[in-house]
Amino acid sequence: MASVPTGENWTDGTAGVGSHTGNLSAALGITEWLALQAGNFSSALGLPVTSQAPSQVRANLTNQFVQPSWRIALWSLAYGLVVAVAVFGNLIVIWIILAHKRMRTVTNYFLVNLAFSDASVAAFNTLVNFIYGVHSEWYFGANYCRFQNFFPITAVFASIYSMTAIAVDRYMAIIDPLKPRLSATATKIVIGSIWILAFLLAFPQCLYSKIKVMPGRTLCYVQWPEGPKQHFTYHIIVIILVYCFPLLIMGVTYTIVGITLWGGEIPGDTCDKYHEQLKAKRKVVKMMIIVVVTFAICWLPYHVYFILTAIYQQLNRWKYIQQVYLASFWLAMSSTMYNPIIYCCLNKRFRAGFKRAFRWCPFIQVSSYDELELKTTRFHPTRQSSLYTVSRMESVTVLYDPSEGDPAKSSRKKRAVPRDPSANGCSHREFKSASTTSSFISSPYTSVDEYS
């Protein structure tokens, strides 16, 4: 993560990349900082030598980035709001899913992982980085320095790839529904694999973390063996892996799913069950698209800030650059608090869960309908009920003649005719139907509860 300009950290450059979500400090630009302390101002910036005394320049820059108390108080409130909403909101989401059997679906297990990642980043990363950025002083010791540089990349990786797993799962459920869905065990394996890959990606941040005690100042930073260019390259790779690549995958999958679900009605699809499942699937996909778009918007300004300040190092001397950084970092961290709000607004079952969680509030009323939303299922899926679906393929309906019991008429006992579109897979009293379908609406083992 790009470092925030402060009185002691104004020269960021490519060395000030920091941890992807977490290290505000300049200490990532420790070489430049030490050069400045030694009086080598020009070499620190890579600028021509000036006649101005380094101590005078240092004092001017320090004054430039000193914030008034009222501004620090406002930023503290803004960051505190993010932490409070993100931690408590995501913990409630986890409780809603794990405490109610009806909520334990494949998609929701990935939402638990997403909520855990977001709550962890908010609790262990946001305020610590804000304090470090404002005071340019590391108060939290060597062990937490390593954790601070390591964990944010891990958590953001887990968050974005949980969303990616949901997108792929939705794609498989809607585009190729007859294939078996992920089991609970397979889902846990996927989640475990996500965290293992996240740990591997973030491990260099832990390995190269350092504490430097300066006169009157303690710094936490990442010192790469080959210097700032290696650090810059690493974080470009991180941006690609935790932002560009997963967003590309989700963009493609949700585009295909959206075309399928909103591409128009299928002729003859008038069954109530079909419309119920279609509506439920649309709601879930719409909710997840909003979650993904929110994440992308929140993190984009921060990544732009990082790239621009790394390439154009003179931007780090702009008098408003610290405010730009604090704003972009706040927006990135705020992505952790929006998901519970989105779930509550767009999903009636999560809304019922939040009502139960806040039932102690005098203005929150939990109705009997809200209780039923979390405790009952709409129907129990079976092989037979799942075939009671909509088919895009032509199927053959075998009609059994009422006179099939008459031996004299056994020769015309049954005949094959094209399926009546008006039947749409729904029950019909005059005949029994047997069809093999390839439905884009239902899989053989999926109920409406999976989507609504």
Curated annotation (Swiss-Prot):
Q: Where is this region: Disordered?
A: 401-452
Q: Which residues lie on this side of the membrane: Extracellular?
A: 1-71, 127-146, 210-232, 309-321
One Pfam assignment:
7tm_1
Which ranges make up the Cytoplasmic topological domains here?
95-104, 169-188, 258-286, 347-452
UniProt xrefs under SMART domains: 7TM_GPCR_Srsx
Q: Where can this protein be found?
A: Cell membrane
Q: Which Gene3D superfamilies match?
A: Rhodopsin 7-helix transmembrane proteins
In alphabetical order, the GO MF annotations are:
tachykinin receptor activity
- Where is it mainly found? membrane
Q: Which BP terms in the Gene Ontology apply to this protein?
A: positive regulation of blood pressure; positive regulation of flagellated sperm motility; positive regulation of heart rate; positive regulation of uterine smooth muscle contraction; regulation of dopamine metabolic process; regulation of feeding behavior; response to cocaine; response to estradiol
Q: List the disulfide bonds.
A: C145-C220
Family recorded in the similarity comment: Belongs to the G-protein coupled receptor 1 family.
Protein function = This is a receptor for the tachykinin neuropeptide neuromedin-K (neurokinin B). It is associated with G proteins that activate a phosphatidylinositol-calcium second messenger system.
Protein name (record): Neuromedin-K receptor
Annotated organism of origin: Mus musculus
The organism's taxonomy opens as:
Eukaryota, Metazoa, Chordata, Craniata, Vertebrata
Name of encoding gene: Tacr3
